[in-house]
Amino acid sequence: MSRVKYTLWVVVGIVTLLWVQAEPTLFGSTNLFQWRSGLVQFSGILALMLMSLAMLLALRLPSVERWTRGIDKGYRIHKWIGISALLLGILHWLAYQIPKWLISLELLTKPARLNGSGPNSNLSGLALWLKEAKPLAMEIGEWGFYALIVLLVVSLWSAIKYKPFRLTHRLMAVVYLLIALHSVILLKKAYWGEPIYWLTMLFIVVGSWAACYSLLGLVGRQSRYPAHVEAFHYCPNSQTLDLTIQLDKPWLGHKAGQFAYLKFAGEEPHPFTIACAHQGSQLRFLIKELGDFTTGLHQRLQNGKSLEVEGPYGKFDFSTQQPQIWIGGGVGIAPFMAGLDWLMTERAHPVHLFFCCHQIDPNLCAELRHKAQLVGVSLTIIDSSVDPHLSADDIARRC
């Protein structure tokens, strides 16, 4: 994560330096409106840069996942980049609007309008088209900004269900394209040919490609596999579904701790941790009833039911270089189930596994005990319905 943060700060620094280079007279100026123009451009370019990176991070590309060291970390970065872009967008909007409000209150004098390019008759081609398109670009940018606020607030609202959440992210790609068009038209003419111009155009091209890639439904397309339900078992005590699926085409394999998206007909894809090590074309999942999709899922299943699997993703690291303590709560035991399978063929330093649950699933606990014994893992099962919650003192005493 620190590597990604460092890279992002370097990019922000480069953008800042190139913007300063493109504004040679700004820092010696006392003209409020010259500063306003520079700040509007700078905040807009930075917001566009972050939005472009957020679009790229959402594509689940293998190269991006390697860079972020896991798609889960990538999505966390994606979230905070999106929030930062919105804050810069608000600064961009305020830098443009506040002087207008002060002029309307007669606290500022409206400056003479200078376009810096001479009479319109001297403009031709692209420059003339861009000038004529400015009013439309202003409207597009303003409404795109309002839409971005609404979509981001909705997507961050914890009470929102999964389908509306996915819809907001699909619409964000459309909003990005509108903001990109706004940026192309309104990027200051004085920047043309400068390094800041070409860097901004690069961000726009990359971000627009990512937005179109998403809108065309290409995200994860190369990692999708047809499959069917092989077996399933539901434990009412823990409200957990133990699902085994059979892939209908060769699976390229996965590492312990990775996850995949499951998509049933008429449903959106949902991510679940794979609860087994690589074992041919079968995958196992432990699914807790937590939301509108997972609640009652066992009642909608039948052996042979078709679904689509996308993955694997994630960079969960079961390092064997030092002793480890594994702690899994409820279905959070899934990656450690895969880890126990993995230890069947790997040598490791001592491992102590704590499994915390509320009301034990007898079948799952029996399986855990059997596998832990086979691979020499110390196992402690804590049922919070009868046992005290696990504490740091408990861990220190047992390990």
Language-model segment annotations:
Residues R3-G13, W19-T25, G44, L48-M51, ...:
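FNR/FR-type flavoprotein reductase catalytic core
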Residues A54:
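Structured alpha-helical
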Residues T25-G38:
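Membrane-interface interhelical loops and short amphipathic "cap" helices
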Residues W35-F42, M49:
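Interfacial loop-to-helix transition and helix-capping segments at the boundaries
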Residues G217-K305, H352, C356-Q359, S384-V386:
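Ferredoxin-reductase
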Residues F33-W35, A265, G332:
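N-terminal low-hydrophobic presequence detector
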